[in-house]
Amino acid sequence: MAKIKLERANERTPLVKTIYTADPSAHVFDGKIYIYPSHDFEHDCPDDDNGDQYIMQDYHVLSMDSLDSECVDNGLALSQDDIPWVKNQLWAPDCICRNGKYYLVFPAKDYEGQFHIGVAVSDSPVGPFTPQENCIEGSYSIDPAVLVDDDDRVYCYYGGLWGG
């Protein structure tokens, strides 16, 4: 597993100034840092308990050659318009590499307003990602974190929210 040394000299804020991001997961694939954040759009929606104040319609993947290098927005990686079961709210994703493919695991709301977990696949860590036609059955959840264990088994940990 690749290691990156964290020092005070590496502190930087913000990573990008062109888009609003939140809730990232970060991974090192082939010696490069990839960051998978939520992408929120600016809007005038009021805050409410349904999360309607979040207009999260797509994912961008950020990348860095090192902690001291410029952070690059690699553009659109996946849009809600390309995911058949999704109505809105693409929240905090995660990504793993397995057998030469990259799997973006993400929560989103369906057309009934329920959160589910979905999966999209790419040959590249920056996408574009092709979504599976359906969400993971029984996954009424948010904030997936995916782990490939030492025995090569894959685990998905997640949180519940609003019926999850």
Model-derived features: positions:
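Carbohydrate-active catalytic/glycan-binding domains of CAZyme proteins
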Residues: 1-164
